[in-house]
Amino acid sequence: MQTYGNPDVTYGWWVGNSVVTNRAGRFIGSHIGHTGLICFAAGGSTLWELARYNPEIPMGHQSSIFLAHLASLGLGFDEAGVWTGAGVATIAIFHLIFSAVYGTAGLAHSLLFDPDLKDGPIPTTKKFKLEWDNPDNLTFILGHHLIFFGVANIWFVEWARWHGIYDPAIGEIRTIFPGYGDFGMVYGHQFDFLTIDSLEEVMSGHAFLAFVQISGGAWHIATKQLGEYTEFKGKGLLSAEAVLSWSLAGIGWMAIVAAFWCAQNTTVYPIDWYGEPLALKFGISPYWVDTGDVSDSTAFLGHTTRAALSNVHYYFGFFFIQGHIWHALRAMGFDFRRVVGSVASLATTES
């Protein structure tokens, strides 16, 4: 974290990042604990939505964010192909069980194991110690993250290929075989990806991402900094705060892209589960409004699931980007205390 040259800086209890900044063991513990919270939220919210689900009202007009995602993945259908929530409670309970496992593991890494991996007894773990101004260390860890993302993409593609996912074009679950190697098709959708209306193209894009991420991950793990580590390559800029700012930029950008996807695309976000497409409006800021009849909507202040998802994603993404700018400026050495001091001195001069 930025200390502005003060070696004895102290942080308040609310600055949670300061506890794990230079302690890789606790950093991992916080990641695992965060995973547990996500699992608990997913499992608990799914049970909450399932208990209130009314089959006489369209799913997109109810509180159905988690149910809609499961339905899109082809889960919750009976043998006749009708969505009844079959097996959804089991999935939710498994998430709650795993949340307890993740929570216990997070506490173990935080309280029982070595807070700094470079002091640990296992030689392999020392490679994952945190050295924020060491590009070789950061690229090694980045490589593993990319491989995990690539594997997740493969799982999704294989799920669609063997189990099948919901195709709104025919109103039922079907298996999807991606066009492996059809990179031209993927490349051709750089600017019109919001209009994709084929699940084969969606899965081909995920297969392409898997290839790029796993290849990039292997590259980052196997390679090191070429030549001298100069200021042009980031010397003096790499820090915990800089990495935090880039992470915020990434998640903010993904949230904004997801908002546009959800608002307009009815192949990835079917009308059957999310409600009708939205219209983009402009007021103090951009926002989306429902275009269909939502008089029967029972949640989200009378709006559809699609409207709730799109608007919340957009505004969260916007504020994540602001957080990116804040932390990026701090990482570059900008002292916001000078702004406060300048405003205070200006006010004193005017008075």
UniProtKB/Swiss-Prot annotation:
One Gene Ontology molecular-function label: chlorophyll binding
GO cellular component, one term: photosystem II
One of the Pfam families matching this protein, by short name: PSII
One GO BP annotation of this record: photosynthetic electron transport chain
Membrane topology: Multi-pass membrane protein
UniProt keyword annotation of Endoplasmic reticulum present: no
Keyword Transmembrane among record annotations: yes
Classification via SUPFAM superfamilies: Photosystem II antenna protein-like
Necessary cofactors: divinyl chlorophyll a; divinyl chlorophyll b
Signal peptide: none
Transmembrane segments: 27-47, 81-101, 140-160, 202-222, 242-262, 309-329
Location within or outside the cell: Cellular thylakoid membrane
Keywords: Chlorophyll, Chromophore, Membrane, Photosynthesis, Photosystem I, Photosystem II, Thylakoid, Transmembrane, Transmembrane helix
Record family assignment: Belongs to the PsbB/PsbC family. IsiA/Pcb subfamily.
Other notes: This low-light-adapted strain contains 7 pcb genes.
Function: The antenna complex functions as a light receptor, it captures and delivers excitation energy to photosystems II and I. The Prochlorales pcb genes are not related to higher plant LHCs.
Protein name, per record: Divinyl chlorophyll a/b light-harvesting protein PcbC
